[in-house]
């Protein structure tokens, strides 16, 4: 699915072999790398991005500039897990009111120049009160032209759409507000950069302390 695509691409980009890939994938996909339904980073903007702040940063405002807007919603893990038939609520986070930033759909063509290949994108719902992200995508570039890369779960593959075409096609869809943008941190966005699994704890500590 869309989140799995982004997780796999991110993990492969920082790994030098399959062993490191699977370890890094585990760190990206689960809180503190602990495999489990309740430790999975289910919510893109409330879980996945914050838990991966050691490698990613929210660049929605950098991309959107003056067009950037914000939206606040309450995220309930308890409600989510209850809907999945899970009764054991140990280690489940309490309900949280979270505010995120996004670039409105009608500004997407204006901000294309600020988007980089490799940016991870979340498509934000309009009317949902308990979730932000409807879909995750990746910005790709071929022959100096930007594309939106998406996962097709039914066909178990990916497909690319020219960015301008994608942005134009989505303008009239009232279900969505806009896009939030995530980007690999500058100091880690180095060709051939490998992050070993045991280095991640230091990067997480650095991210939590706010140090550079």
Language model segments and positions:
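Acidic/His-rich structured neighborhood in mature extracellular/periplasmic domains
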Residues: 1-98, 116, 123, 144-145, ...
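Generic preference for flexible, low-structure residues
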Residues: 22, 41, 59, 137, ...
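Generic detector of well-ordered alpha-helical segments enriched in charged/polar residues
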Residues: 22-26, 90, 109-112, 167, ...
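Short alpha-helix capping/helix-loop boundary micro-motifs
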Residues: 100-111
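Active-site-adjacent substructure of cysteine-protease-like catalytic cores
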Residues: 110-130
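Low-complexity, Gly/Ser/Thr/Pro-rich intrinsically disordered linker/tail segments
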Residues: 117-120, 140-156, 160-212
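Short, surface-exposed coil-to-beta transition loops
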Residues: 131-136
């Amino acid at each position: 699915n869309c989140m799995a695509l982004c997780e796999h691409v991110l993990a492969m980009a920082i790994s030098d072999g399959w062993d490191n890939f699977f370890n890094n994938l585990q760190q990206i996909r689960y809180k503190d790398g602990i495999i489990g339904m309740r430790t999975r980073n289910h919510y893109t903007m409330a879980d996945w991005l914050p838990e991966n702040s050691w490698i990613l940063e929210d660049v929605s405002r950098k991309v959107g500039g003056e067009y950037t807007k914000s939206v606040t919603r309450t995220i309930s893990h308890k409600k989510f897990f209850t809907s999945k038939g899970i009764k054991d609520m140990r280690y489940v986070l309490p309900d949280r009111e979270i505010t995120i930033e996004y670039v409105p759909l009608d500004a997407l063509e204006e901000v294309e120049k600020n988007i980089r290949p490799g940016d991870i994108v979340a498509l934000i719902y309009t009317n949902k009160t308990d979730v932000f992200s409807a879909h995750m995508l990746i910005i790709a570039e071929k022959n100096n032209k930007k594309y939106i890369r998406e996962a097709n779960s039914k066909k178990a593959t990916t497909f690319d759409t020219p960015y301008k075409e994608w942005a134009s096609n989505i303008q009239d869809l009232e279900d969505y507000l806009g896009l939030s943008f995530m980007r690999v941190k500058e100091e880690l966005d180095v060709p051939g950069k490998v992050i070993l699994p045991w280095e991640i704890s230091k990067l997480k500590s650095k991210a939590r302390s706010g140090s550079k």
